[in-house]
């Protein structure tokens, strides 16, 4: 039996890659064949800052994490600064976890010292009154 597609039917699929399989950031992915890729249009969705503001209402966390994310993108250093990651920083800050512990376990994890220095050097629209920014600068000096 053939079932006709409803005129309003749409399929939306999401992926962390462009269909070419594993890379350095997403190692557990498989490539899709050309016929499958041909059936879909690629639409890039960036992180939604308004959603992040609603979920994690801390100007200090958001300003730091957005500046850090922007610097990562600007420098093309392969490092993910996701909404989920911002949430982890926010929740740990709310629980009173020390800033340096948050930075080490959730922000600069898996980055080399050179990459951290490069990212920090490219952060903008933030100043040392932000406890995360001053903390990361101190962390760099101790690493």
Task: Place the predicted regions along the sequence by residue.
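C-terminal regulatory/interaction module of P-loop NTP-utilizing enzymes
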Residues: 1-143
């Amino acid at each position: 039996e053939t079932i006709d597609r409803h005129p309003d039917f749409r399929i939306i699929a999401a992926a962390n890659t462009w269909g070419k399989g594993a890379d350095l950031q997403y190692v557990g992915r498989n490539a899709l064949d050309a016929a499958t890729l041909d059936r879909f249009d690629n639409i890039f969705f960036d992180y939604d800052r308004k959603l992040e503001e609603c979920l994690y209402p801390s100007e200090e966390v958001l300003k730091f994490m957005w500046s850090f994310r922007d610097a990562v993108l600007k420098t093309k250093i392969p490092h993910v600064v996701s909404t989920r990651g911002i949430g982890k920083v926010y929740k740990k800050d709310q629980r009173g976890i020390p800033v340096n512990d948050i930075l080490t376990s959730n922000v600069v994890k898996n980055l080399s010292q050179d990459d951290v220095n490069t990212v920090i050097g490219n952060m903008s629209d933030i100043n040392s009154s932000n406890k995360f920014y001053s903390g990361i600068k101190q962390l760099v000096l101790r690493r």
